[in-house]
């Protein structure tokens, strides 16, 4: 098992990364739990892992109840959030009841947002069961639900008490979901660590085969990079925006196609290539760099091109992006592979040229 600590102005908390951790969840997490816990999970994860977690909590003397939600990005909304609140109220959850998110990014984001708002703030912990949530969404305190006009538009910054990533849960992940998570892994190398990017180029087959040693190394490096950035910029006033590489284009894809049609990681993958193409247009990187990024994404089973839709739709969706400031669109581009930069775009012609092959 590897452990690292996230330090933020709010508070510090541990991330546990390894194999076979879920049966130890009670003992590992007990210092970070109240006397009572509410397990929030979904219909897909519950048959696989809920019983193991319940047994672990029983062994640690933590009483608990469970709330089982429908699965999928299409359910990341007010209606499903209210199901969490209904379950908490019906079970007389108190302010010190710890919410436990057992699932992927959707469960983690919604559980965190519920925790941030239930009785004005209840503690929560993350037990991510997908690669995407283990390397990205479970760390850093971003919580949210979607709105029909934009992804993750309603939410809060609210840090968990702990994160427990059991890599064994990835063995039940569908291949498409594994690839989607790998998009975020590749994103980290692309935005901030060229040596990690090169390591991924060398080890992608082993990672996709879930070989234990390279997998724990990759997950740890991603969490380490995110923890370092969040420690410097908890509420995304500056460099934390780098973590949104590919997300401005990616969120537009998800919104246009309908939440869940393209998985988040798939949209981010195509978005990263578009961000590289935009950086090409700005004279920052070469076409060869963009092709190299696309090749690595394709090696992970990911799309390197977006779906085709009208330029006006792209602009409409991207105008709702959370990085827009004073009406100016801000993108995360690349100075070079391994170095992200915040880029303001006032000339939409450069966006049209970037997107032209896909219009």
Swiss-Prot record:
Cofactor: Co(2+); Zn(2+); NAD(+)
Functional description taken from the UniProt entry: Catalyzes the conversion of 3-deoxy-D-arabino-heptulosonate 7-phosphate (DAHP) to dehydroquinate (DHQ).
Protein name per UniProt: 3-dehydroquinate synthase
Enzyme Commission numbers on file: 4.2.3.4
UniProt similarity note: Belongs to the sugar phosphate cyclases superfamily. Dehydroquinate synthase family.
Organism per entry: Neisseria meningitidis serogroup C (strain 053442)
GO molecular function per UniProt: 3-dehydroquinate synthase activity; metal ion binding; nucleotide binding
GO process terms (BP): amino acid biosynthetic process; aromatic amino acid family biosynthetic process; chorismate biosynthetic process
GO cellular component: cytoplasm
Known catalytic reactions: 7-phospho-2-dehydro-3-deoxy-D-arabino-heptonate = 3-dehydroquinate + phosphate
Subcellular location: Cytoplasm
InterPro entries xrefs: Dehydroquinate_synthase, DHQ_synth_AroB, DHQ_synth_fam, DHQS/DOIS_N, DHQS_C
Main location: cytoplasm
Origin: domain of life: Bacteria
Cofactor binding, per record: Binds 1 divalent metal cation per subunit. Can use either Co(2+) or Zn(2+).
Pathway: Metabolic intermediate biosynthesis; chorismate biosynthesis; chorismate from D-erythrose 4-phosphate and phosphoenolpyruvate: step 2/7
Binding-site positions, Zn(2+): 184, 247, 264
Binding sites annotated in the UniProt record for NAD(+): 71-76, 105-109, 129-130, 142, 151, 169-172
């Amino acid at each position: 098992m590897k452990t690292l600590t996230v330090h933020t102005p709010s508070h510090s908390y541990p991330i546990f990364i390894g194999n076979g951790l879920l049966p130890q969840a009670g003992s590992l997490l007990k210092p970070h739990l109240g006397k009572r816990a509410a397990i929030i999970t979904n219909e897909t994860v519950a048959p696989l892992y809920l019983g193991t977690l319940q047994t672990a909590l029983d062994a640690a003397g933590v009483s608990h109840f469970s709330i089982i939600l429908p699965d999928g990005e299409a359910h990341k909304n007010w209606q499903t959030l209210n199901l969490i609140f209904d379950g908490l109220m019906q079970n007389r959850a108190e302010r010190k009841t710890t919410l436990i998110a057992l699932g992927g990014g959707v469960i983690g984001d919604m559980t965190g947002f519920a925790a941030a708002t239930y009785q004005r703030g209840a503690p929560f912990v993350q037990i991510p069961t997908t690669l995407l949530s283990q390397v990205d969404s479970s760390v850093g305190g971003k919580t949210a639900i979607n709105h029909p006009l934009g992804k993750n538009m309603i939410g809060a910054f609210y840090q968990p008490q702990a994160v427990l990533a059991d890599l064994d849960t990835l063995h039940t992940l569908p291949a498409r979901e594994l690839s989607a998570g790998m998009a975020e892994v590749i994103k980290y190398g692309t935005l901030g660590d060229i040596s990690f990017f090169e390591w991924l180029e060398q080890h992608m087959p082993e990672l996709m085969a879930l070989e234990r040693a390279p997998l724990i190394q990759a997950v740890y490096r991603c969490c380490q990079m995110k923890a370092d950035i969040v420690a410097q910029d908890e509420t995304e006033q500056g460099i934390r925006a780098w973590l949104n590489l590919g997300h401005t284009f990616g969120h537009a894809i998800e919104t246009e196609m309908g939440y869940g049609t393209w998985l988040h990681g798939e949209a981010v993958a195509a978005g990263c290539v578009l961000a590289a193409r935009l950086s090409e247009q700005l004279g920052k990187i070469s076409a060869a760099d963009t092709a190299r990024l696309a090749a690595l994404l394709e090696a992970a089973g990911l799309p390197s091109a977006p779906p085709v839709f009208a330029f006006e739709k792209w602009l409409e969706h991207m105008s709702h992006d959370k990085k827009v400031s004073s009406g100016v669109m801000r993108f995360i581009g690349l100075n070079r592979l391994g170095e992200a930069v915040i880029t303001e775009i006032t000339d939409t012609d450069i966006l049209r040229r970037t997107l032209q092959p896909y219009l």
